[in-house]
């Protein structure tokens, strides 16, 4: 429930930061607070504290927001998602890669948080489709699908390192 409340109002909070005129900021804050308070009757009492926190925080400053300002109890992946939304990024963009058929000169780029990722190749479109072929895609190496000859390349957009969190040098 918290995620729904936060994600639906992150855009209005970020709009406060992008609005330069004080009157514009006041209007956005008022509309944010109004939309939060109209939902308060359908949300348990503890979330009204949360809505007041968002409304008052947005009214006080139009500076960069931190996740702790919006949702202090967020941790782990949820905190990363909220931080990315506050910065205007979408972490889900790396989950469903789409694009043109990868060639040797221009491989299909797959984004990953780590130096390795499991990828599935469904082939091209129409008659070029095939059963999904699963493989490990590694940083710095391209991979050619053995069925459709599509090429893939990994782009690391996160902290890097192995996906299990353990380095090879700890043995």
Swiss-Prot record:
- InterPro entries tied to this protein: Cyt_c_oxidase_su5b, Cyt_c_oxidase_su5b_sf
Q: Name one GO cellular component term.
A: respiratory chain complex IV
* Gene3D superfamilies per the UniProt record, alphabetical: Cytochrome c oxidase, subunit Vb
Name the GO terms of the biological process aspect: mitochondrial electron transport, cytochrome c to oxygen
Predominant place of localization = mitochondrion
CDD domains, from UniProt?
Cyt_c_Oxidase_Vb
Cite a single Pfam family from the UniProt record: COX5B
Q: Does the keyword tRNA processing apply?
A: no
Which positions bind Zn(2+)?
A: 121, 145, 148
What keywords are assigned to this protein?
Membrane, Metal-binding, Mitochondrion, Mitochondrion inner membrane, Transit peptide, Zinc
The places in or outside the cell where this protein is found are: Mitochondrion inner membrane
Return the transit peptide range from the UniProt record.
1-54
Q: Which domain of life is it from?
A: Eukaryota
Which molecular-function annotations from GO does this UniProt entry contain? Answer: metal ion binding
Q: Name the family.
A: Belongs to the cytochrome c oxidase subunit 5B (TC 3.D.4.11) family.
The protein's role, per its UniProt record: This protein is one of the nuclear-coded polypeptide chains of cytochrome c oxidase, the terminal oxidase in mitochondrial electron transport.
Q: What is the protein name given in its UniProt record?
A: Cytochrome c oxidase subunit 5b-2, mitochondrial
Q: Which organism is it from?
A: Arabidopsis thaliana (Mouse-ear cress)
Q: Which gene encodes it?
A: COX5B-2
């Amino acid at each position: 429930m918290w995620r729904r409340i936060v994600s639906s109002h992150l855009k209005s909070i970020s709009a406060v930061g992008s609005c330069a005129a004080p009157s514009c900021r006041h209007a956005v804050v008022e509309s944010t607070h109004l939309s939060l308070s109209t939902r308060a009757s359908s949300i348990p009492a503890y979330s009204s504290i949360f809505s007041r926190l968002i409304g008052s925080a947005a009214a006080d400053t139009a500076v960069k927001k931190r996740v702790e300002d919006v949702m202090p109890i967020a941790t782990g992946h949820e905190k990363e998602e909220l931080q990315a939304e506050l910065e205007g990024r979408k972490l889900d963009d790396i989950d469903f890669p789409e694009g043109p058929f990868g060639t040797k000169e221009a491989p299909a780029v797959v984004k990953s948080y780590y130096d390795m990722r499991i990828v599935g190749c469904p082939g091209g479109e129409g008659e070029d489709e095939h059963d999904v072929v699963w493989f490990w895609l590694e940083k710095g190496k391209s991979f050619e699908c053995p069925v459709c000859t599509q090429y893939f390349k990994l782009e690391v957009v996160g902290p890097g390192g192995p996906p299990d969190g353990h380095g090879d040098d700890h043995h």
